[in-house]
Amino acid sequence: ALLPTGPAIGAGTSAVSRFTTSGGVWVRPDNVQLAINATQFLATTPTLWDSSLSVTANGNYITTRTWAGAATLTTAGASTTTCNNWASAASTSYGWVGLPASSRKSTAFANYATMGGITQCDNTQHRVYCLQQ
């Protein structure tokens, strides 16, 4: 889970804090609607998005886990949920992951906390959610 320096969401920061709630429809790279606007996408309710976050920037569909870093979009990450602020690739550090194929926010964003190999920071199989407003 060692990530390059950049705009990643780290410890003490929620995903919501990086976006404004203005703007129109949010869509995936394949143009499928995620929510009618930023407010709906970023809010804790409703509990479902219109579609899942299961499409990569290249248009590939995925079902594997994705690094999330916190329990919800509105919850700030901690060093224990973000692989030490995404700076650790050690098997003794952990990060929270979600399931991008789910449109249920609680499952998509952080379905798993500390669960052995699934969330150990040396796991190179997980992708990272990337949102652009």
Regions found by a protein language model. Give the residues of each.
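Secreted/extracellular ectodomain signature
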Residues: A1-Q133
